[in-house]
Swiss-Prot record:
One of its GO terms (molecular function) is glycosaminoglycan binding. Residues 399-430 have a biased composition (Acidic residues). Residues 393-436 are annotated as: Disordered. This is Testican-3. Its main location: secreted. PROSITE patterns: KAZAL_2, THYROGLOBULIN_1_1, THYROGLOBULIN_1_2. May participate in diverse steps of neurogenesis. Inhibits the processing of pro-matrix metalloproteinase 2 (MMP-2) by MT1-MMP and MT3-MMP. May interfere with tumor invasion. Glycans are attached at S387, S392.
Length: 436
């Protein structure tokens, strides 16, 4: 009888201690100013000095390469399995969903996704079920020093060069220092005027800004395209977005527009463009985007964005024609589409592909007019030269060649579903499902 009583007392004490610990954790979360939400924690938010925004505003475009070693954590980092549970730093760490806390010492803890943790274990040749201790890492750890930002060749900003070298070692990639300071790199041509003196930027300076930004967007695009699932993970609301209206420019320019357009309204306001204004001494960057706003409504539409960059480059038709001639060499490839250029090097309104017998209408930059492609000669009497006609006050539908066939299939399925819903609405009267 005494043994049974002792066992009951021990169980009751253990249950009480667990209840008190749970209550203390809940009270700590409620007592915090952020309500236990790590997205509201100041350490996760951007600062005024880095992005010129108010403290307490979540910046979706902060450089994730530098975020708490999420991307750079590897099983090779020290891991002490004999940590005192009372001093476990993970007790103070709030990880998001699908992530686990890994304690490296008494003061360092990082949140690692389950998938990334398993992937890193496989790369290291260690089964996560058999992991019993640290793995020797060949990547040199960086000391704590005063930040000296550098821009890497992958388009990301690093707090100092050692961080860049460590990131390259962990990822097994070749990353070099492109310039000192934040990305994008400034032009090589020094400015002789004072930084406080506002002046008008020349066309040559606008072209340099456009080329520099285009190179930066390309580096970011190529770096982000290595993981095709990133687009789906980072843009969960894309399925609610009308994909029939997309930037008419392709590749990195259209990709960057979609990344900046955080509210999916096909317009870039000043808060969305502010992520690009990283170099305070570069006066022509903001002036360049101001020149893109042809409607002067403080908004840049998808078409204004594309044409603003396109008009700052060499004549597009002549450039494409020269590239085709270089690829062909002496031999002329059968079935090759040859663009028709005007005397200024821009595209003629009517373009035809003789091998397939189709013609279509384009603007002077080669952007195809939706619905104009037919078998035979197209009637392209309208002048599609743009100087703000398709700006933020006027939407036009364009197709995006980068969309996958699955996306096109999904769009067709959605159209069929909409038709069925319309039929149901006609039969059901005034019933609504809550969507407009």
């Amino acid at each position: 009888m005494l043994k049974v009583s002792a066992v009951l007392c021990v169980c009751a004490a253990a249950w009480c201690s667990q209840s008190l610990a749970a209550a203390a954790a809940v009270a700590a979360a409620v007592g915090r100013s952020d309500g236990g939400n790590f997205l509201d924690d100041k350490q996760w938010l951007t600062t005024i000095s880095q992005y010129d925004k108010e403290v307490g505003q979540w910046n979706k475009f902060r450089d994730e390469v530098e975020d708490d070693d999420f991307r750079t954590w590897s099983p090779g980092k020290p891991f002490d399995q004999a940590l005192d549970p009372a001093k476990d730093p993970c007790l103070k760490m709030k990880c998001s969903r699908h992530k686990v806390c890994i304690a490296q010492d008494y003061q360092t803890a990082v949140c690692i996704s389950h998938r990334r943790l398993t992937h890193r274990m496989k790369e290291a040749g260690v089964d996560h079920r058999q992991w019993r201790g640290p793995i020797l890492s060949t990547c040199k750890q960086c000391p704590v020093v005063y930040p000296s930002p550098v821009c890497g060749s992958d388009g990301h900003t690093y707090s100092f060069q050692c961080k860049l070298e460590y990131q390259a070692c962990v990822l097994g990639k070749q990353i070099s220092v492109k310039c000192e300071g934040h990305c994008p790199c400034p032009s090589d041509k020094p400015t002789s005027t004072s930084r406080n003196v506002k002046r008008a930027c020349s066309d040559l300076e606008f072209r340099e800004v456009a080329n520099r930004l285009r190179d930066w967007f390309k580096a970011l695009h190529e770096s982000g395209s290595q993981n095709k699932k990133t687009k789906t993970l980072l843009r969960p609301e894309r399925s609610r977005f009308d994909t029939s209206i997309l930037p008419i420019c392709k590749d990195s320019l259209g990709w960057m527009f979609n990344r900046l357009d955080t509210n999916y309204d096909l317009l870039l306001d000043q808060s969305e463009l502010r992520s690009i204004y990283l170099d305070k001494n570069e006066q022509c960057t903001k002036a360049f985007f101001n020149s893109c706003d042809t409607y002067k409504d403080s908004l840049i539409s998808n078409n204004e964005w594309c044409y603003c960059f396109q008009r700052q480059q060499d004549p597009p038709c002549q450039t494409e024609l020269s590239n085709i001639q270089k690829r062909q060499g002496v031999k002329k490839l059968l079935g090759q589409y040859i663009p028709l250029c005007d005397e200024d090097g821009y595209y003629k309104p009517t373009q035809c592909h003789g091998s397939v017998g189709q013609c279509w209408c384009v603007d002077r930059y080669g952007n195809e007019v939706m619905g104009s492609r037919i078998n035979g000669v197209a009637d392209c009497a309208i002048d599609f030269e743009i100087s703000g006609d398709f700006a933020s006050g006027d939407f036009h539908e364009w197709t995006d060649d980068e969309d996958d066939e699955d996306d096109i299939m999904n769009d067709e399925d959605e159209i069929e579903d909409d038709d069925e819903d319309e039929g149901d609405d006609d039969d059901g009267g005034d019933d609504h499902d809550g969507y407009i």
